[in-house]
Structures are given as C-alpha cells and as structure tokens.
Amino acid sequence: TGGGLIPEGRPNPGIVHTIAMSGNEMPTIYRIEIQTLAGTGKLLVSGPLSREPVRIAFDYFKAHASRVSGSIRAGEHDFHLHLVDLQGGGEPDVSTLASLIALCSGALGRPVQSQLAIMGDMSLGGVITPTRNLAESLQVAFDAGAKRILLPMSSVGDIPTVPGELF
C-alpha cells in the first residue's frame, strides 16, 4: 500500500520522489527534499542514505549546471539535501539521479511535474543506469500515487517483463 505517498499537485521546487531498492531488497518510495540558501557552494546531507551517491550527484551538478541553465550559480548557494524514507525500508541502493534532478529543481526554483516518480541511477560520468526490478518498482510507484514515471532508456529492454495492466 502507500496510496497518497506521492501526492497530487505540483511539489515545491527541489522535491522529488524516487523508487529504489531498500536494504531488504524491496522497491521503496523515497522523497528527496532540497533547501537552497545563499552561500558558497556547500552541501549538507541528512536522512537515511549513503553520502557517496549524493556527493556524486552534487559534483556532477556543479560541473554541469550551466548546461542545464545559465541561471544556475551553484557556487553562490549552499544546498541541504534531505532524504525521507516514506515506507521504512532503510537506505536506498541508488539515489544519484534523483538527487541530481532535485538539485536542479531547487537551484532553478522550478518544480518537477506532479505525481512524478524517478527511477534509475547515474554514474559520476553521467551514464544513466537501468532500474532494478522494473515491474515491481512500477507497481509500487503507481500504488503510491505516481501518474508519471521518469524511466531510463536503458530500462526499455525490461518493459516486456511488466504486466500489461500496469500500463
């Protein structure tokens, strides 16, 4: 269950929902929240997640922010990234891609689409990796209220494993 964990309406800028495998190897819903403040380009991380994936996202964000928008000045702001485990699953196995999208949303002051769930991950070099357990992850996302899924192209080959009733 978990209906309503991904609420209707546009989220505030810097807030994204992601589906990742938790410590118990179950697809779990997480919310990433970014707070952007005037500063010098520092990152503070809180919540039940490994700092390494967030550091990769932040380093990529700082290196490539101008490719997203010329108005992003990563060195003129500090960012606080907080992860909320919405289903009690513990630390997620992936969080880099969703963290990057949350950082961009927060820095631009623009929300992501309503009821969006982000899947997949990203390497330091920007390579997007596929979603693990695609069918289960989609089911969890839809049960939680997601109406839109951001899915890596690298997961397209797994679409035939998804039951038709999920589409």
Q: In which residue ranges do the predicted regions lie?
A:
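Peripheral, non-AAA+ core regions of ATP-driven protein-machinery
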Residues: 2-18, 23-167
